[in-house]
Amino acid sequence: MKEAIKKKAIRRLQILEGQIRGLQKMVQEEKYCIDILHQSLAVKEALSGVENLILENHLETHAVEQMKKGQSIKAVREILSIYKLSRKRS
């Protein structure tokens, strides 16, 4: 993994960790449901950002290497499988 992307991903995951702890506390304290949902959506968005970083890394490293080695079909299949999974979540 590229060092710059790794650092960004770890930092964002640390922030997410705090957000999830906050979300858990909100549920334990029976905060207003809409406020909990807003926080939950913020967590989802932040996690999506981490996924984007990981995908960026994959495309810039692994996918490029696969294509250089004549494994472009494998690279395309991997990317399509992730794309299909992301569409199911939407």
Q: Model regions: which residues?
A:
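Solvent-exposed interaction patches of small proteins and small membrane subunits
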Residues: 1-90
